[in-house]
């Protein structure tokens, strides 16, 4: 089977198979990097670690209004990047790291950002930043430790979702944004929840897509297996990259991101091609993500519990009732079942909507028509 056929059922299906919503497009984005916690201050993590300096790579689309009231902060999922929308020009693309180039020229939610789209840069100042701990330009295991001059690697301190939210809040300070609409999916939805609980005065509206209030035993089990695939790779144990482990980790994760309905519809006539698809996704993942960032961020996900130190999940979610909130589940999501998202929405006094799709957890990235319709009824 051709690579394009496999890719068309991969992460960028919406980009490859759906026509553009508008003949217009946004200008080629220019990624920027900001030092948000300089060396004179440093960054102390929730679990007691320390980073001498924290930088975040980010992109913006549109212009902040004079009243500074049109910002939208979008948080990406586990292996996403700051590149939310648009297409890099050749000069920008050549300036990127090999991992960023492997991620691709097109933004990961491109079909929702642009003229006439739900996140129109003519109306909104859209901000998207690569999470702390990732490998796409923000401070992470690949970054140089200022004290040693060498990459942190396996010495990078463990993070929590609250650490990720705190770094994103400092980015808003850097950009002069006091308050924003906050949107996140999957891991990004967890960060959005924590951001709203930590900084409620900074959230105009909250949108949580395909994310739970607590990372429970089912989701943690998938992360555990993916990490074990990496940690048990003989090459990783020798201190080298983990090619076999990373490919297997991705395959395990893809099974949690998809659903039986989608696999049957796509591969039912030739079941062996489903295996080829997983192998392809694993090989592709090797080129575009780093094992240490995968370990750091997946462990951060496993710390996610909005109720920790707040009297339990339900009591914590009650604090969100003053914020207009929308929770979006997916009817075939195996990773974070719809009932889990619906339950969180009820406790938060939030609206609840559900994406109908055979594609499982990844539907929030694929079913952009439904996502746009849902957001259109909620955003101002």
Curated annotation (Swiss-Prot):
It catalyses: L-homoserine + acetyl-CoA = O-acetyl-L-homoserine + CoA. Keywords: Acyltransferase, Amino-acid biosynthesis, Cytoplasm, Methionine biosynthesis, Transferase. GO terms for molecular function: homoserine O-acetyltransferase activity. Transmembrane segments: none annotated. GO terms for cellular component: cytoplasm. Its EC number is 2.3.1.31. The keyword Cell inner membrane does not apply. Its main location: cytoplasm. Residues 70-366 form the AB hydrolase-1 domain. The active site is at residues 186, 333, 361. Pathway: Amino-acid biosynthesis; L-methionine biosynthesis via de novo pathway; O-acetyl-L-homoserine from L-homoserine: step 1/1. Substrate binds at residues 250, 362. The keyword Acyltransferase applies. Disruption phenotype: Methionine auxotroph. It is found in: Cytoplasm. GO terms for biological process: homoserine metabolic process; methionine biosynthetic process. InterPro entries: AB_hydrolase_1, AB_hydrolase_fold, HAT_MetX-like. Transfers an acetyl group from acetyl-CoA to L-homoserine, forming acetyl-L-homoserine. PANTHER family: HOMOSERINE O-ACETYLTRANSFERASE. NCBIfam families: homoserO_Ac_trn, PRK00175.1. Belongs to the AB hydrolase superfamily. MetX family. Homodimer. This is Homoserine O-acetyltransferase. It comes from Thermus thermophilus (strain ATCC BAA-163 / DSM 7039 / HB27). The gene is metXA.
């Amino acid at each position: 089977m051709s690579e394009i056929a496999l890719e068309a059922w991969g992460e960028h299906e919406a980009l490859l198979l759906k026509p553009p919503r508008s003949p217009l497009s946004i200008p080629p984005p220019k990624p920027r990097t900001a030092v948000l916690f300089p060396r004179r201050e440093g960054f102390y993590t929730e679990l007691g670690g320390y980073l001498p300096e924290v930088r975040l790579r980010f992109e913006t689309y549109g212009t902040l209004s004079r009243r500074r009231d049109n910002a939208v902060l979008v948080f990406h999922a586990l292996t996403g990047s700051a590149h939310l929308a648009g297409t890099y020009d050749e000069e920008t693309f050549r300036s990127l790291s090999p991992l960023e180039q492997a991620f691709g020229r097109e933004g990961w939610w491109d079909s929702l950002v642009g003229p006439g789209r739900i996140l129109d840069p003519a109306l909104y100042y859209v901000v998207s930043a690569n999470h702390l701990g990732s490998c796409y330009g923000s401070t992470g295991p690949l970054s140089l430790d200022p004290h040693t001059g060498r990459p942190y690697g396996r010495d990078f301190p463990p993070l929590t979702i609250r650490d990720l939210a705190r770094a994103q809040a400092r980015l808003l300070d850097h950009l002069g944004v006091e308050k924003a609409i906050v949107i996140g999916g999957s891991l990004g939805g967890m960060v959005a929840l924590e951001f709203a609980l930590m900084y409620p005065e900074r959230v105009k509206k909250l949108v949580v897509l395909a994310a739970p209030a607590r990372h429970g035993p089912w989701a943690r089990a998938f992360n555990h297996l993916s990490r074990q695939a990496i940690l048990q790779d003989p090459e990783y144990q020798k201190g080298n990259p983990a090619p076999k482990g990373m490919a297997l980790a991705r395959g395990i994760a893809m099974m949690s991101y998809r659903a039986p309905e989608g696999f049957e519809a796509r591969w039912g006539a030739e079941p062996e091609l489903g295996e080829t698809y997983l192998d392809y996704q694993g090989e592709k993942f090797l080129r575009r993500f780093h094992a240490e960032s995968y370990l750091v961020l997946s462990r951060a996900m496993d710390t996610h519990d909005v109720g920790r130190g707040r009297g339990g999940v339900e009591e914590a979610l009650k604090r969100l009732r003053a914020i207009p909130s929308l929770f979006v589940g997916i009817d075939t999501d195996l990773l974070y079942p719809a009932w889990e998202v619906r339950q969180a929405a009820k406790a938060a006094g939030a609206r609840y909507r559900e994406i109908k799709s055979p594609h499982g957890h990844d539907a929030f990235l694929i079913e952009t028509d439904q996502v746009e319709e849902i957001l259109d009824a909620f955003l101002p």
